[in-house]
């Protein structure tokens, strides 16, 4: 995709990805979503429930329950990923969070049960509570080297079999439990 996407566009993408604006399953079969050439903008209709699009943000619950998605390429100009944005995308196995993203909301990737590795960009400074809760295949997390402290919500990797955590040399975690991580690098 290339160009601007508003709430109406996101609604159609949801339907093509297996879930409509009311949370009901659709026959959509879109599995790979490349948003690298996209600017998300205000406007259009609501995309899910009463949620509407905002500039440079994958808003709250944007792709919630879009179970057909397996891979998403996030725009490089994105600043924020909202609460539950990819929640219950059970088949999502690949996502790279670009460097410009500053905030990742609570439960943003809740129950992305096929997600095995996540890479988090260097400008992220806040990650909400339970952001990766119940990502039951998540074995590796990479925090790209950044210059700022990182505020991490409690139980970031709750119910995840995380084995390796790669941490850039300038990162400082606040309110973070390392749980059962086997390798810290």
Where are these regions (language model features)?
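Structural signature of tandem-repeat unit edges
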Residues: 1-5, 23, 27-56, 67-80, ...
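Short, T/G/N/S-enriched strand-turn elements that build extracellular solenoid repeat scaffolds
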Residues: 8-18, 84, 141, 154-155, ...
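Short, solvent-exposed loop/turn and secondary-structure capping segments
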Residues: 12, 45-46, 132
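Intrinsically disordered, low-complexity boundary segments flanking structured domains
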Residues: 13-23, 106, 128-130, 152-154
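Leucine-rich repeat
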Residues: 13-26, 61-64, 176
């Amino acid at each position: 995709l290339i160009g601007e996407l508003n709430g109406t566009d996101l609604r159609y993408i949801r339907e093509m990805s297996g879930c409509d604006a009311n949370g009901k399953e659709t026959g959509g079969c879109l599995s790979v979503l490349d948003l690298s050439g996209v600017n998300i903008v205000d406007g259009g209709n609501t995309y899910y429930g009463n949620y509407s699009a905002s500039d440079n943000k994958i808003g709250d619950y944007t792709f919630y329950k879009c179970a057909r998605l397996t891979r998403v390429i996030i725009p490089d100009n994105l600043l924020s990923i909202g609460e539950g944005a990819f929640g219950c995308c059970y088949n999502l196995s690949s996502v790279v969070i670009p460097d410009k993203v500053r905030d990742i909301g609570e439960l943003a990737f809740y129950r992305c049960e096929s997600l095995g590795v996540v890479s988090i960009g260097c400008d992220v400074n806040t990650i909400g509570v339970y952001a990766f809760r119940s990502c039951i295949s998540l074995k590796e997390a990479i925090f790209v080297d950044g210059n700022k402290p990182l505020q991490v919500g409690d139980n970031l990797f709750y119910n995840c079999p995380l084995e390796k955590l790669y941490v850039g040399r300038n990162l400082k975690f606040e309110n973070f439990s390392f749980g059962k991580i086997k390798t810290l690098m």
